[in-house]
Structures are given as structure tokens and as C-alpha cells.
């Protein structure tokens, strides 16, 4: 379950993570926000999250690696989100530097492709197909944004995405 915590644009709140975690014990709950530092990762853990979203375009290489490793140290998974091919190589490098993406059958790191341009907010569903051949097979793939129907979910699954974020 992805829980928006960004208050200004999305009316989110960190308390929502705690509420959802309490209501759905055993369910993976991810903090979805514009995280820029390890303290926000710690906040997510303290609120009961089991994972965090890390947007590669918002982070330099050192921040991305630090936040990814810190999330893992806290026992959290990290969904590293890319929008453009520019962020693919450095995101994969950061994920690999943090250790195996899957340990004991549990995802520690996932690689997400967001087909919504964060600047214009326009959705380009074709981005999933464009980037799919370049995504490594050993890191779980997530299709983010633009998936609004079962047929679209089937399309991204056919491209090799094992997971999808549906909704805002």
C-alpha cells in the first residue's frame, strides 16, 4: 500500500502511514513523498512504514546511495523511481551497491518507472515500453502512474513489470 505523506500538493500526512499500518497488519506500507534526507527515512520507519519511495531525479548519487543503504539498515525496502533513461544507470548502480535486491524472498530494492512527467504531470504510457528492455532482470520492476485498468496492468506485466502502483 502506497501512502502519500506530502502535505502541500497532495494533502498527505505522515500520520496516515501509522493509521494504514495499524489497520493492515502484515501488509507492506510505503511512504510516498519527496524524500531528500535520511531523517525522512527514519520518520517513515517510526511511523510504521515498511518501505520508502526514493525519486532518483531529486537526489544526487551520494544522497541516493545513502538513503538506500539507510533504508535497508532500518529493515525497509526502497522503491527507486526513475522517469527518464538518464537516471537508469545511476539508480541501478546505487541499488547494486546497496546489496542484493531480493534477500530471503523479500524485496529490499525495487526499480520503478514513472510514466508521469513530474514537471508537466502528463502521462506517457509508452515510457514503460521504451525503458523495459533496458531494465535489469534481477531487480523487481514497478510500473508507476498511468495504470488505470486491468488491461493496462496486463500490458505492463507483458513488458516485464511484476508490480504496478495504481492511483495517485
Language-model region placement:
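Catalytic cores of alpha/beta
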Residues: 36-48, 84-98, 143, 147-166
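A cross-domain feature marking catalytic cores of carbohydrate-active enzymes
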Residues: 5, 31-33, 56, 80-84, ...
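Catalytic-face loop-and-helix region of soluble metabolic enzyme cores
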Residues: 104-166
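Conserved alpha/beta-domain cores
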Residues: 92-99, 104, 119-120
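Short beta-strand/loop segments at the ligand-binding rim of alpha/beta enzyme cores
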Residues: 20-32, 73-83, 134-144
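Glycine-rich phosphate-binding active-site loops on the catalytic face of alpha/beta enzymes
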Residues: 3, 43-63, 102-107, 112-118, ...
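Active-site-adjacent beta->alpha loops and helix N-cap segments on the catalytic face
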Residues: 6-25, 33-42, 54-72, 86-91, ...
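Short helix-capping and hinge/turn segments at secondary-structure transitions, especially at repeat
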Residues: 72-77, 93-97
Amino acid at each position: 500500500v502506497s501512502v502519500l505523506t506530502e502535505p502541500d500538493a497532495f494533502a498527505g500526512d505522515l500520520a496516515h502511514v501509522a493509521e494504514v499500518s495499524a489497520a493492515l497488519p502484515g501488509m507492506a506500507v510505503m511512504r510516498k513523498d519527496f524524500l531528500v534526507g535520511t531523517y525522512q527515512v527514519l520518520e517513515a520507519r517510526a511511523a510504521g512504514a515498511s518501505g520508502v519511495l526514493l525519486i532518483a531525479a531529486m537526489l544526487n548519487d551520494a544522497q541516493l546511495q545513502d538513503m538506500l543503504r539507510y533504508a535497508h539498515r532500518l529493515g525497509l525496502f526502497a522503491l527507486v523511481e526513475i522517469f527518464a533513461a538518464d537516471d537508469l544507470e545511476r539508480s541501478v548502480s546505487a541499488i547494486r551497491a546497496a546489496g542484493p535486491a531480493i534477500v530471503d524472498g523479500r524485496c529490499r530494492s525495487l526499480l520503478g518507472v514513472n510514466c508521469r512527467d513530474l514537471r508537466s504531470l502528463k502521462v506517457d504510457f509508452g515510457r514503460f515500453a521504451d525503458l523495459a528492455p533496458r531494465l535489469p532482470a534481477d531487480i523487481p520492476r514497478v510500473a508507476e502512474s498511468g495504470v488505470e485498468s486491468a488491461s493496462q496492468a496486463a500490458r505492463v506485466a507483458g513488458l516485464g513489470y511484476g508490480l504496478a502502483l495504481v492511483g495517485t
